[in-house]
């Protein structure tokens, strides 16, 4: 998912590509955005709001459902070193349709003492985002959120930072992202509307820095210039929110060496994916994957030269 040119691997009208951010923050354009996707079976799709609580040691976490992407299998979105048939066969081997790829859009809420921390903000109201409704299911009001941690600035992770009225969606929250990511986001012309809304509310950090008690940023390089994950530690347990280090619970794990259309630096992203999966398989650390099937919580298990995703329903 690419904030600048809005490359999400599906068919989007050219006018929407040029004016996506304006559409997100203009009430009149919200209707245009919805209409643009209405006749396309592939695209961001609405989902039922959901909030799945689970424990990490004594810490309370909640997986929040936001939306779903359905994309054509074009043989290059997730397998630019492959072809349509090769990608399709990999999907069929996991009992999935071979003509499409389905990705969830999930966010993670962490209650840490008096802090209510949201990791990523989803698509936003213009493109079927259900995050606010899912927060409601969790019993959390937008003005209770104290921190919004951003893995990276692609629109399916930052679009929900502003509401349909163009104002801050989380008015009392500090928005935190890496210094490199904020600089890159500000350089993207199509992100200008959102940058204007959140500027003055953003605090940056260097990856590796502690963000909150028990929450540390982790460099997961390659997807965007400042992409990070967040490691949450509670007692003897830990969880890594991987952001967009991986997108498909099948392809990303079975073929971590395949380059991805969405990665800014494909070679670095591939190396990060391979190294991180190897570490996670060895440590058995819990993982939150925003684009894996909701609730996106599970573990990475070694499977020969590849890996398997094992959901761990809280």
Briefly describe each language-model feature range.
Residues 100, 104-107, 127-174:
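Active-site metal-binding motif and surrounding structural segment of the metallo-beta-lactamase
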Residues 66-67, 121-123, 153, 180-181, ...:
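Active-site metal-binding loops of divalent metal-dependent hydrolases
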Residues 4-23:
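Bacterial N-terminal signal peptides that target proteins for export
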Residues 50-138, 229-246:
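Conserved beta-strand hairpin/beta-sheet module of binuclear metal-dependent hydrolase folds
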